[in-house]
Amino acid sequence: MLSKSILTGLFGLALCANAQTEAPVVTDNCPTDLYHSQLQIKDNTTVRGYIDAWTDSEIGMTFRVILTGIEGHQALLYHIHENQVPEDGNCYATGAHLDPYGRGEQPPCDIGNPATCQVGDLSGKHGPAFAPDGTEFIAEFRDFFLSNVPGNPAYFGDRSWVVHAPDKTRLNCGNFEKIVPGGKK
């Protein structure tokens, strides 16, 4: 009898561990803030580009992503990561994806249910970057789960974004910077 109780308890804990926490819609963003991140100029990749983020209301953020140098008809992944890129430019030092609600990477993000994805999984929520050779990828989308307010768990303004190959190799990265009228902060 005791072993059945223990097994039942362990099963319940396993279910709780696999339960996904949905990210809340951000409703207190600052409509005057603009963030920009430029990818590095690196010898080991042709991928270049930038990402901008802004909002005209308190709900969600609008992102514009432009990437060039996507070779071989690849669909590249891109995410906001926990840490900034260090001065040596090491994209692997940026840590894991921004995931303040502990969702984890498995199962993969469901583009049809973005509240259940990692907050920083931009390509999972909005689609991967693809462009034929010699052309650029351009995407603009609204993300309701990221924040431009310091102190919010989903705040991205002091973090980085990383572009990955399909096998998750980190190709390039850059830090977000807040842009103020007349120049960078």
Describe the residue ranges of each PLM region.
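N-terminal leader/targeting pre-sequences
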Residues: 17-185
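Fungal secretory targeting signals
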Residues: 1-21, 185
